[in-house]
Each structure stands twice: as structure tokens, then as C-alpha cells.
């Protein structure tokens, strides 16, 4: 459930596979779910390279992963695959926090992974000119401040002091955004593509929940009938 919630918001993803074990049943499941929820691009990291001495085994695992990606309509032959060890990179950085590019082979492999992500996964066009809309992913109560709803802004912008509507599940109600935060940084505004927390005036935690949306007043209405597509994941 958490994987689906997160993946549905992604511009791209990193598929991590153990180089020592190869693709596991959950690897297939994650690739399938990524395709079903519309993750457009993937980059692969073959982890635990330090546990594999046989270069042919690494090649075999890479081939398996590429075939699996192709089965689920990802471009398996073209997707970048980086081989390394997250643990070895963490150990190197823990021992020498000032490690820079070129100082350690394991750290360099992680940097190469991020370079591939930057190059292969395109930054999509953000719909910042459309009416503000954010699906509520989680809700928190902060003592002394109020209720914070978190989520990824799907479209538009939101500024501190603007009025919004809480739509869905319960009766639609209005409130004012008194704070916008992203990764513990206070912002003046958030925009499409940002994962933010919105502090909402006069709203209690029980007034809002996942499944509701926060939107520009009058821009969206709840419906009791809709058409949808269901994919039943079998074991």
C-alpha cells in the first residue's frame, strides 16, 4: 500500500536489486506496480556488489533484470544499470565525511547512479498555471501550531494566506493556509511537483484524512459516481 501511494507521485524511480540474489518475487511486483500507477522511467541499482566475486554472475543478474523490465513494457535494453554497494559507500562516508568524487570507488558508484537518474529521468512540465490541487497523503497535529496536511502538489501554486477548500469524504469546507513547509524548510509558496506540508487554520486532525483533496475554492467538486480501471494483484 505504501509503495503504491509513493509510486503514484513519482517522476521516476530507482529499482534496487541485490546483485548477490538477483530479482526476487517482490522485484517483479514492484516493477508491475510501477507500470500500473504510471511511473514513466526507472533506473536500476544492483546492490551488494561487494558480495559477488564472479563477473559472469553480475552479468547474468543484469540480464535477468533487463528481461523482467521488458516483460512489463519498460525499455529493458535501454534502462541504465549501475552496480555498487550502498553499505560500502555509507561506511566510506562515515569514516571520511569529506569524501569527494574520485576519492572512493564505492562512493563514486553512488554518484554515478545519481548522474544516471539526472540524465535518464526527464523533469516533466509542471502545471503551475492551473488551479491549485493537492491530494492529502497524511495528516499531523503539531502542538501549539495546529493541523498539517502533507502531500504532493499536483497542479498550480499555493501561498501563505490563501484560502483553500477541503473536498471529499466530508462536506466541503474552507480554510486558510497559514504555513507552507518542505523538508523542514519554511516557504512562502509551494508549486506543482513539490512535496509539502500545509498548516491549516481552524482545522482539527479529525476533520481531514487521506483520500481528501485541498483545492482552489470552486475548482473541484466531489462525485458519487465515476468510471475507473481496477487491476487485481494476484500472488
UniProtKB/Swiss-Prot annotation:
What's the protein name?
Answer: Elongation factor Tu
Point out the gene that encodes the protein: tufA
MF terms in GO: GTP binding; GTPase activity; translation elongation factor activity
Query: Record's family?
Result: Belongs to the TRAFAC class translation factor GTPase superfamily. Classic translation factor GTPase family. EF-Tu/EF-1A subfamily.
The UniProt entry, under SUPFAM superfamilies, shows:
P-loop containing nucleoside triphosphate hydrolases, Translation proteins
Keywords, sorted A to Z? Cytoplasm, Elongation factor, GTP-binding, Hydrolase, Nucleotide-binding, Protein biosynthesis
Per UniProt, the enzyme's principal EC class comes to hydrolase
Q: What Gene Ontology cellular-component terms does the record carry?
A: cytosol
Q: Where in the cell is it found?
A: Cytoplasm
Amino acid at each position: 500500500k505504501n509503495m503504491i501511494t509513493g509510486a503514484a507521485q513519482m517522476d521516476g524511480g530507482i529499482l534496487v536489486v541485490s546483485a548477490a540474489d538477483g530479482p526476487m518475487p517482490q522485484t517483479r511486483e514492484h516493477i508491475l506496480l510501477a507500470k500500473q500507477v504510471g511511473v514513466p522511467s526507472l533506473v536500476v541499482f544492483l546492490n551488494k556488489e561487494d558480495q559477488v566475486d564472479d563477473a559472469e554472475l553480475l552479468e547474468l543478474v543484469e540480464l535477468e533484470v533487463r528481461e523482467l523490465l521488458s516483460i512489463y513494457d519498460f525499455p529493458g535494453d535501454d534502462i541504465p544499470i549501475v552496480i555498487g554497494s550502498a553499505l560500502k559507500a555509507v561506511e566510506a562516508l562515515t569514516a571520511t565525511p569529506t569524501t569527494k568524487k574520485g576519492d572512493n570507488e564505492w562512493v563514486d558508484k553512488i554518484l554515478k547512479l545519481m548522474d544516471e537518474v539526472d540524465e535518464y529521468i526527464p523533469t516533466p512540465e509542471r502545471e503551475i498555471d492551473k488551479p491549485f490541487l493537492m491530494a492529502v497523503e497524511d495528516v499531523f497535529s503539531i502542538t501549539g501550531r495546529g493541523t498539517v496536511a502533507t502531500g504532493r502538489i499536483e497542479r498550480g501554486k499555493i501561498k501563505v494566506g490563501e484560502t483553500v477548500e477541503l473536498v471529499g469524504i466530508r462536506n466541503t469546507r474552507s480554510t486558510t493556509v497559514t504555513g507552507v513547509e518542505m523538508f523542514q524548510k519554511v516557504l512562502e509558496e509551494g508549486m506543482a511537483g513539490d512535496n509539502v506540508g500545509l498548516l491549516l487554520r481552524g482545522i482539527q486532525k479529525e476533520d481531514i484524512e487521506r483520500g481528501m483533496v485541498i483545492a482552489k475554492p470552486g475548482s473541484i467538486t466531489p462525485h458519487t459516481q465515476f468510471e475507473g480501471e481496477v487491476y487485481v494483484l494476484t500472488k
